[in-house]
Every structure is written in structure tokens, then in C-alpha cells.
């Protein structure tokens, strides 16, 4: 237990404060500090990874331990409902790979439609987000750094928010960059929104343009703004 917990208005709504032992200190912007000098994404082609250019890529680059059964079922249902689509996950370990593929087969999905992204240098990791059509967030433990990595590369990420801190992180990041409409609040809404975007290329392209503007205009990737806000909080605490 600590004395203070840094938060923002989305991560911990006021009606949730009673569940925390610490005093909640609210930053005026997203609670997550981000550097502004991540490698610039370089445009890549799907064929670089042996993927046909017409294939729709759903992806999730979080740790495999974050993949709950409920959310994985949604992803498999998306594969069932979106022809010529694949699910691109981050390399984990052989046991996780086989368990996920086996579950998919039992669910009636060709396990070859689930592929794994090898560990690569950070520059390439950021750049390969440019070929992802839609990044699917995990629940109840959201993407954290992987969410900001995706947005830095201009990749839309669809999240589902719950009541806990860990389940609201991607929502906080999306709100900061001006993409509140990529936040959903239940499984049905999450699935419907993902399928809609997968079938509406024009809306998906507009989202990518909005993310590009948000990357430049929002405070999400402006560490000087974050530090100034944090220093103001420190000063306030020292004088009270």
C-alpha cells in the first residue's frame, strides 16, 4: 500500500475511489507517461510476413496470459464472420501456441488462421503495426504499453472497459487521443464494433487519419506536458 496513487478521471471514476486504500491523485490528462521519441513507423507490406495483401489482419500483441477464454471466443467468432481474415498474436511459448490453436480447432476454426509474430527489433515491431487492420484489446487486463505502441504506429485498437484499473487503461489512452468511439463496455458491443469496422474500410481509414492527428495534437506522446503536470502535483502535495 502506498500513500498516493496517480490516476486520471477515466482510469478511476470518482465512484470507485472507495475501493482504494491510497489517496487518488488525478492527472489532468492520461495517467500513462509516454516517450515522444519512439522509432518512427516505416510502412510495411503484408507480404513481408507471408500474408496475402487482401487478408484482413486482426491482431493482439499483448502477453498470452492476458487472453481470457471469453475474449478469445470473440476473436474466433470474428474469424468465423470475416472471410479471408487471420488473427496475429505475439509470440509467447510453445504451450500457449498449441493450446490456443487447439481451442480454435475445437471451435471450428482452421488453426492456420492464427499466426504468431516473432520477437524482432523495436523498430520493426513498431513498423509491423502498419499492416494490422484492427488491433483487438484483451480483457479484463487491457493492453498498456502495447496499446500506445499501436496508436503511435497509427493502428486502431478496439478495447472493452470494465470497472477495474487494469480494464480501463486502453480506454484512458484512446480518450486522450480522441478515439472514444473505440471504447466498448460489453462483449456484444465489442464484437459488433469489431465486425463493423472489419467490413467498413472507409470508416477504418477515417479512424487511422484521426489517430494520426491525435498522435500529433494530443498530450499522449508529449512527455514534457506529462512532466509539467506531475511536477505541479508534487508542488501541490508539498505545500499542503
Where are these regions (language model features)?
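Active-site-proximal region of nucleotide-activated glycan assembly enzymes
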Residues: 1-43
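Short, conserved active-site loop motifs that form the nucleotide-linked donor/cofactor pocket
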Residues: 3, 24, 113-114, 180-181
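Conserved catalytic-core segment of nucleotide-activated headgroup transferases in glycan assembly
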Residues: 29-121, 128
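C-terminal amphipathic helix plus adjacent low-complexity
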Residues: 52, 62-64, 77-80, 90-92, ...
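Short acidic loop-to-helix transition motifs that present clustered carboxylates
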Residues: 120-123, 143
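Catalytic binding pocket for nucleotide-activated donors in carbohydrate/polymer assembly enzymes
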Residues: 129-130, 134, 138-221
Amino acid at each position: 500500500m502506498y500513500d498516493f496513487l496517480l490516476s486520471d478521471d477515466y482510469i478511476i471514476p470518482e465512484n470507485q475511489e472507495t475501493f482504494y486504500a491510497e489517496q487518488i491523485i488525478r492527472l489532468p490528462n492520461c495517467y500513462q507517461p509516454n516517450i515522444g521519441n519512439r522509432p518512427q513507423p516505416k510502412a510495411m507490406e503484408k507480404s513481408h510476413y507471408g500474408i496475402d495483401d487482401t487478408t484482413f489482419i486482426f491482431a493482439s500483441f499483448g502477453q498470452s496470459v492476458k487472453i481470457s477464454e471469453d475474449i478469445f471466443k470473440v476473436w474466433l467468432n470474428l474469424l468465423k464472420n470475416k472471410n479471408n481474415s487471420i488473427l496475429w498474436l505475439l509470440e509467447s511459448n510453445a504451450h500457449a501456441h498449441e493450446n490456443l490453436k487447439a481451442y480454435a480447432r475445437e471451435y471450428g476454426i482452421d488453426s492456420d488462421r492464427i499466426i504468431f509474430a516473432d520477437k524482432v527489433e523495436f523498430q520493426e515491431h513498431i513498423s509491423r503495426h502498419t499492416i494490422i487492420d484492427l488491433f483487438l484489446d484483451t480483457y479484463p487486463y487491457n493492453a498498456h504499453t502495447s496499446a500506445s505502441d499501436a496508436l503511435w504506429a497509427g493502428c486502431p485498437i478496439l478495447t472493452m472497459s470494465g470497472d477495474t484499473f487494469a480494464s480501463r487503461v486502453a480506454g484512458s489512452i484512446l480518450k486522450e487521443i480522441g478515439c472514444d468511439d473505440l471504447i466498448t463496455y460489453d462483449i456484444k458491443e465489442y464484437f459488433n464494433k469489431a465486425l463493423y469496422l472489419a467490413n467498413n474500410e472507409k470508416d477504418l481509414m477515417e479512424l487511422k487519419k484521426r489517430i494520426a492527428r491525435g498522435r500529433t495534437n494530443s498530450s499522449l506522446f508529449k512527455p514534457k506536458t506529462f512532466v509539467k503536470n506531475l511536477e505541479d502535483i508534487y508542488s501541490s502535495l508539498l505545500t499542503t
